[in-house]
């Protein structure tokens, strides 16, 4: 690590609880956020939820709106000198109902008590490690980059970039190098489940074998096999015997040991896909203009509880008074983090809609090429932030409900020098096949030529790849003989 401001800065660096909370809230789905809000409501008497009232005066409505909107300007590091008058302590806290307790959610009780996710499980272990603040920040970014199978979905350079971005947010001029990330990654890979954070199946299996006791039978032979991973997956036993010097019996025993490992260590944390999703953002068309808004049904209206805040005595240093002051700071931090989450979500969703208006007008064929970097640069956020805010967040459109990540697709060149979206090309292939003569189905080469006539230059093998991803059989299998 290169320090331009000295070792003292690195030693004093701390990943503030507020920043940790803001990062975590960004990646929560709407249901997970609802659960988190309820946990905060149950544990902090200074935080309360504004309940909807059927008959409210305009003055009351305006006051409630101001209380939520002003949360962005709350200074979490300072309490006003003049607080309301002192009041007797009352430890009774009335539980506020949540959207999850409405009748329409009664059948979804399991969602409120689901097992910890993979990332939550890993963060719990990371917080127990004696990492330096910078290493802990690196670990958070590594965990954030895990996919559902437990593999590291980002390369080391991307992790470094994410860490640098967060350090800059905290105004620290510290340069993190790839070697440091690799060291932290090795620690992560040896947490439970072992092999988590691997960059390939070979590395995943290697970490698990290496973690076994040295007295484990055939451990040494299994490690030898993994050094010839390509021969192993191709099941070329003769070459394996020649390369490793193992006889057939030892080879079989080593392979049997490898079969006891977990190829996808994060799979046990995968949650079954729900048959419903709640939209986070909605888009609608009015007077030839598209409007984006957050789903009002899931927007939490939070505020500071005036009753308990009125008990805080400015000059009182008692434990009870200090407890209330701390709880007020935590409540303000939480309100601000939730508010920032929604502002970021709306900003990113609006940018995506701006790029994909043609999709809204004509469907998948109108999808434009768009990648995380495009949106990140436009809204002036880091790619990792855009990734967090588009994962498990859903946009309700006139054409259906879509995860925000659905609107990202790779670029494919066109004959005119422009670019087309891979999603749009898949849609065109699907339409061509749907309209083909079943007695003379279109070959991949014919489809490629038809796309070229539309200005989309794709190879036959690319068409085959897209066709297979759509689960469309080959032309010979589609042919109908009558």
Swiss-Prot record:
GO cellular component: DNA-directed RNA polymerase complex
InterPro entries in UniProt: RNA_pol_sigma_54 (IPR000394), RNA_pol_sigma_54_core-bd (IPR007046), RNA_pol_sigma_54_DNA-bd (IPR007634), RpoN_core-bd_sf (IPR038709)
Record's keyword terms, sorted: DNA-binding, DNA-directed RNA polymerase, Nucleotidyltransferase, Sigma factor, Transcription, Transcription regulation, Transferase
Ranges in coiled-coil conformation: none
Alphabetized Pfam families for the sequence: Sigma54_AID, Sigma54_CBD, Sigma54_DBD
Motif (RPON box): 459-467
Location of region: Disordered: 50-69
Biased composition annotated in UniProt, kind: Basic and acidic residues: 55-65
PROSITE patterns: SIGMA54_1, SIGMA54_2, SIGMA54_3
Gene3D superfamilies reported for this sequence: Homeodomain-like, RNA polymerase sigma-54 factor, core-binding domain
Molecular functions per Gene Ontology: DNA binding; DNA-binding transcription activator activity; nucleotidyltransferase activity; sigma factor activity
GO biological process, one term: DNA-templated transcription initiation
DNA-binding span(s): 371-390
Similarity comment: Belongs to the sigma-54 factor family.
Task of the protein: Sigma factors are initiation factors that promote the attachment of RNA polymerase to specific initiation sites and are then released.
Name of this chain's protein: RNA polymerase sigma-54 factor
Annotated organism of origin: Acinetobacter guillouiae (Acinetobacter genomosp. 11)
